[in-house]
Amino acid sequence: MSVFYTNIQLAGDTILYRGIKHGEPVQFRCNFSPTLYVLSNKEEEFKTLSGKNVTPMTFETAKKAREFIQQYDGVEGFEVHGYERFVYQWIRREFPGEIDYNINQMKIFALDIEVQSENGFPNVDEAAEEMLSITIKDMVTKKYYSWATREFTPPEGVEAFIFWTENEMLNHFLGWWAQNTPDILTGWNINLYDVPYIARRVNRVLGEKWMKSLSPWGRANEREVYVQGRKNYAYDISGINILDYFDLYRKFTYTNQESYRLDHIAFVELGQRKIDHSEYENFKDFYTRDWQKFMEYNIQDVELIDRLEDKMKLLELAITMSYDAKTNFEDVYSQVRMWDTMIYNYLTDRKVVVPPKKIREKDAKYAGAYVKEPKPGLYDWVVSFDLNSLYPHLIMQYNISPETLIDERHPRATVDRILEETLDIDGDCCVCANGAQYRKDIHGFLPEMMQSIYNERTIYKKRMLNACLLYTSPSPRDRTRSRMPSSA
């Protein structure tokens, strides 16, 4: 039976752990002692990127480790190596190998709320309008749960809880939530609407203590998020991964849509529209005159999220990426954090420590990629080339990596001289168009990583194409060929 984490936080000096053990949810607190490395004159197990020996220093608490880093920051000749995002040190220590996870053992909820609109669209900032209903779909068991402030006939498969006041509804919802806390919460724009509205409304109606009970650790923190210059509110609910399907769709699909409303995206991807209520004058008229249809409208939103996931597997993609990198699920939105952690794990496997973190102010502009200026005119036989995984291949081609970079730039390198093949290049180095030079006598860790990831991508791309051929080709011969093992 497998053991895997679902969420790990570092609160002060304490690890807050949630995960699955042998199919059952587990949750605990524990202390953590981070490890850093300093230069050593003796032969040691771990080395720096440049090959220097380093010795480990284990600290009693994360606070003491941070104080040590600050104490020697800027001290000439004293280097403190090691990954400073300590929570990922703990993950690696507890899960050193490949993580054997099972999505079907997690609690993954799709959430949608409906709110009164007595004075236009409800304002999250004030959370002054009463909540009318809450619907959750467990995307693993496929069960529905609806809380409502009026009676309705629940569709088949929906467990309904009916109350006469918002206060009663919220009390029951929070009690149920505490007994069924999800590992992942999703929905459409829940990060900037549903979750902050619930949190602010509960805080307003029941008090801060009840609001913080949304978190299994009693930790729910508000933060400001600016979107196109407009201030929004989001909540970090400790222990729960909020993976907004709206954000996942924007990040992992590569076509621009004319609208990102759920109604439009569901039509584009599923051929289905949300329940139409245009016969009513406004939203208030809708829930006042046809409560049954209104609740079906609420329930349909979480059903659409589940159908989108069945087709697109964006949650599954985020989960897979997170376990590959050994990060939390929400980290998929941060490319820097994902890559930093992947590099940390890759180097640690090879007994190499992460170099000291350098903070630089961006006070200068950097030249972008070279773009050849087109010459206007009429041309025959025009072709277009799309290079496969261009940036990774450039990194591999030029052996681009921190430890292979040479301090001196090539004195005569320019784009034009390289294109005209008039530049003399010493065979000991790779020379880039901007004059940067990279050693060739050692293989950099970054191109090694790129090659490994690209090889895996090639294997799974072929498997995907074979699967597509199997299900779309009418030819028995093609179907037979698709079952043949890939040579990759």
Where would I find each of the regions flagged by the language model?
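Conserved RNase H-like, two-metal-ion catalytic cores of nucleic-acid enzymes
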Residues: 3-10, 14-44, 95-184
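Long, highly charged low-complexity segments
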Residues: 49-109, 113, 118
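Short helix/loop capping segments that flank catalytic or ligand/cofactor-binding pockets
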Residues: 118-121, 145-146, 196, 251-253, ...
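Short secondary-structure boundary/capping segments
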Residues: 125-128, 196-209, 397-404
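Active-site-proximal helix-loop-helix substrate-binding element of RNase H-like nuclease domains
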Residues: 144-147, 154-160, 164, 181, ...
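Common nucleic-acid-contacting/processivity interface regions adjacent to the catalytic cores
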Residues: 281-402, 408, 470-473, 479-481
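Helical catalytic core of nucleic-acid polymerases
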Residues: 381, 387-473, 479-481
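Hydrophobic alpha-helical segments, chiefly the membrane-spanning helices
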Residues: 482-488
